[in-house]
């Protein structure tokens, strides 16, 4: 069973382009913040990393969009860790609409740097 982290989010003005569609950079920022919160909840937060001179860094992100959400739309971000591969830490995420339909499916690869 995978450990899930979920956050509900209503897209605001800073999250969307002039066309009122989700900006990819806003999605990445939200995924990064949710991943950090989840890592902290799992015991790999600041006291185990940054306070010891270690830094989490995102190396790669991939995402597939079924539909791009729009301004003022309520969405749910779900993220979970994958199996560690040596010094690489994969993490997966999906963005769901208000009906639970998948809007985005993605993955990110994290490194723990000294």
Model-derived segments and their meaning:
Residues 1-58, 113-114:
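Hot-dog-fold acyl-thioester-processing enzymes
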Residues 2-3, 62-114:
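HotDog/MaoC-like acyl-thioester-processing domains
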